[in-house]
């Protein structure tokens, strides 16, 4: 009887340790570098953003142009078909949807919505203005919330927006490298 109780306690303890173990495995899995064909990784730490993202490769599209704006947004432009901005925020998709509905200039249509992503298009009826496609993505990286969207000042086609979304979904946490002055 004592042996049975001991074996039962040993098995129960093993399950308890496994179930209550450290969650580092999920963190490691989310830190894997996702490769996209024709893209290369861009580390954003030098602009104060502890993350990296896959952007179209420089060989075929030109060097990434990265600018930290006065309002705190990090704008990344590569060639003519890639332009995004990343900034701290709440990532409130519902608020954006309300803004789109109440817009007095544009007629907006939501094309697709996921938990952290909104894809929409805007048009000014009978104006001759080309339909604009946009996206808004909410990313939580190292417990900070970031809002990522296409550059509103540019015009991108639907396929360009889809390609940017694929790149944005590769965002991952990359801690800043320690320097001698940190010690």
Language-model-detected regions and their locations in the chain:
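N-terminal secretory signal peptides that target proteins for export/translocation
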Residues: 1-2
